[in-house]
Amino acid sequence: MNEKTLYFAYGSNLNLDQMARRCPDAEPVGRVRLDGYRLAFRRTGGGYLTILPDKGNHVDGLLWKVSAQDEQALNHYEGFPHFYARRTVDVQGKGVGHQAMVYVMNAPYKDEPERPSRYYWNTVLEGCRQNGIPMQPMLEAWREAEQACRPQKHRDTFESPDR
């Protein structure tokens, strides 16, 4: 039997083209919501999205069904187990709850705000557009990283998501 795992994507893996390359067996299930978390760009040297606990907030994302081979590919791309850890979360979509696997950035990386590269930013935004995911939380996460990193400049990050 080829059982598939439910996977909650909230960053660059919202992008349908990227997921088709990385995980050819993956099937999008639909938009879902994770309550009690917010998005944040973290990691020195070029920010990547993670989720951080925040009771008054939520993260919109995409639920995928992934095969065992897809999971292995995701583990590789997400730097599991060192950069990201895997967790199980409860997500809601169209009034139905699901338990899904999610990648959450580990310490010390999650404690280091950083702006994303333009390439990563554009990949995430295209995924939002493709799936009808609101972009405002992405902008808020970018602004939070910008405030924390204002005195520093990194060669691969950019000054404003509006340019």
Map each language-model feature to its residues.
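Glycine-aromatic micro-motifs
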Residues: M1-R163
